């Protein structure tokens, strides 16, 4: 990539099975789940941590105190999905949206995937199973680079390499979003139990840094809202 890799990009790329022909089994599964909510939360976390948006109280008439997003001065990020979200935050019509509503209505998977295709990191591929039935999927343009990303993830989550702050953020997003099934080792893979232990450990380590440009509590509130969206009682 020619610029900083966002949390959402990394999560989406990790959810794509490896194409390495030497591996008989893909080392990670790609089950249906709550990936879209988690990718949307990743975009929000990125914007809050960079100081582009703030999480502010929004007292509702019926539901008491909730939180929403507020733009902190428009500065393009260079990422199409992030800038699209910034534009939505700036729209006065969205001023009363709660954090949970921001997570539900994002369409993040499509936006992040389309951006990666546009930038030549992923390519559109269609599998034909009959004259009229086709299955669309996005595949890495450079399998070696994709394999390196997956190996880096395994080094941290299976082989206990010292994590970066972004690794801890990935763990926190996966745990809060209940989306770990997108990157979990396939059942029966050695180290699967350790993976879950490591995931919880790194999630607990995640402590967003606070600076004059942003409030670390905003990230915590995004993760808490993500957990509520994915709670069994939420219906999702």
Where are these predicted regions, by residue range?
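Short, structured motif recognition centered on aromatic/hydrophobic residues
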Residues: 44-47, 116, 169-175
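Short, well-structured alpha-helical interface segments that form or flank functional binding sites
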Residues: 38-42, 107, 111, 168
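Short glycine-centered helix-capping/turn motifs at secondary-structure transition points
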Residues: 51, 120, 178-181
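Intrinsic, low-complexity N-terminal interaction/targeting segments
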Residues: 6-28, 98-100, 129-161, 165, ...
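Short, amphipathic alpha-helical interface elements at domain boundaries
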Residues: 1-104, 218-236
